[in-house]
Amino acid sequence: MAKLTKRMRTIREKVEVTKDYEINEAIALLKELATAKFVESVDVAVNLGIDARKSDQNVRGATVLPNGTGRDVRVAVFTQGANAEAAKEAGAELVGMEDLAELVKKGEMNFDVVVASPDAMRVVGQLGQILGPRGLMPNPKTGTVTPNVAEAVKNAKAGQVRYRNDKNGIIHTTIGKVDFTAEQLQQNLESLIVALKKAKPSQAKGVYVKKVSISTTMGAGVAVDQNTLSTTVA
């Protein structure tokens, strides 16, 4: 049997796996246990009451977190003409069409998000086998295929997160860094859950948001008591 590290022993002692923690307590616990030598991300797992086997119950989209993600995001944009200039002015690191596609084919992908205008999809479509497995393929549902590429670039830079349920109906994404304030992390979490509720498939029955857990990069998951979150959808 593998020997537990000091860090793992501390986590086991501090975190009650069967308890739903009030949000303030959950965040304080994460911060206390974040002892890595780098600034850890704060991630969230949201268990949704959907049947992930059915395409009409899958949840996918994007939302801009009010306090960003704490990450520097590099954006590549496939577009041309006036849109190309607008994308550059909005802060895109790479802008092009066939020339940008050639870089991707060579494996030169120094970017985190790909945006495309509709007229560029004839070029981007040829890159599906490269971009798809990396989660970089532009999609209208996440706002990355759009005539307004400048806005998409600004959203990506401002802290937009994309979400998509896995085969078990769970959404995994980030809500910031462990050096964010407790208030910033709570606001980001609440904003994400509101976005997920707005994206609820009409075919989903029963309890929709079943469980919410937060964790740091190197830490254990801490279940959050949803009653301590403000996530009412108007």
UniProtKB/Swiss-Prot annotation:
GO cellular component, one term: cytosolic large ribosomal subunit
BP GO annotations: regulation of translation; translation
Pfam families: Ribosomal_L1 (PF00687)
GO molecular function: rRNA binding; structural constituent of ribosome; tRNA binding
UniProt keyword annotations, A-Z: Repressor, Ribonucleoprotein, Ribosomal protein, RNA-binding, rRNA-binding, Translation regulation, tRNA-binding
Domain of life: Bacteria
Disulphide linkage map: none
Subunit field text: Part of the 50S ribosomal subunit.
Family, similarity comment: Belongs to the universal ribosomal protein uL1 family.
Function: Binds directly to 23S rRNA. The L1 stalk is quite mobile in the ribosome, and is involved in E site tRNA release. Protein L1 is also a translational repressor protein, it controls the translation of the L11 operon by binding to its mRNA.
HAMAP family listed in its UniProt record: Ribosomal_uL1_B
Record's protein name: Large ribosomal subunit protein uL1
Lineage: Bacteria, Pseudomonadati, Pseudomonadota, Gammaproteobacteria, Alteromonadales
